[in-house]
């Protein structure tokens, strides 16, 4: 048996102390790491829409906020006062990028004008996700939107059917600069020309999504074309303008009206039979899917380039159905 010496006792004590110190240091490191992880800020994603005035955008906002909770990210949601303020939206994008976000969600008012700012985002390795309206660039890693060409073509088919396959029709489109405006206008007009040769599109005007301007434009069209049989409004503001014009000129029941999106005034008109029906998007789904794609892109996870959020036709027969209820906002 080895005899104990003062030197050996000292060595053993020193070893024990060092072992305890190492264990304490390791535990402290784990605790600090855990605290740091808990205190790490959530990734920030600014969500910039085309506007704030329509209930459509409020529904998109609800979806975006739900995704922010589910995917543990922080979002802000903003848009210009109306959908004609392209410069205002560009300022918002510039200000958002200056905050160095981890990603950006954008519904572009002008599919071309925003591209230089998106190049800056790309250079800063900030993934961009489009929603509702795409851009003329492959910079966005994904775009969550309705297939607006197909949806507007479907609206053209419905209108042609409801007027008996022949006659004069017109349309109010929200703009000719955003991807949604271009696609809905083209989808409607081209489908009517190619599939319904006996239906003539006599006028297409652009109201900026503004109800008052759209009302004035629709009234002018109706007065210029007394034989008008059908009218298409391509978004919430546009169709409300058409409904106002039809009412003011006492043409309710004489002109077949078809719309896009939802909102209380449009839903009431459909229930009363003043409006034949409308194409509904899934605004909550659009908001959710764009933030989901952005959150995944931040982590480097793959996301589909195009996220088709779908559309449905609704009229008096199915407006209160369980299938339509989640898609129709007030």
Task: List the predicted regions and their residue ranges.
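Short hydrophobic transmembrane-like helices used for membrane targeting/insertion
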Residues: 1-2, 17, 30-32
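A residue-level marker of the well-folded mature domains of exported/periplasmic proteins
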Residues: 4, 8-9, 13-16, 37-330
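Bacterial N-terminal signal peptides
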Residues: 22-33
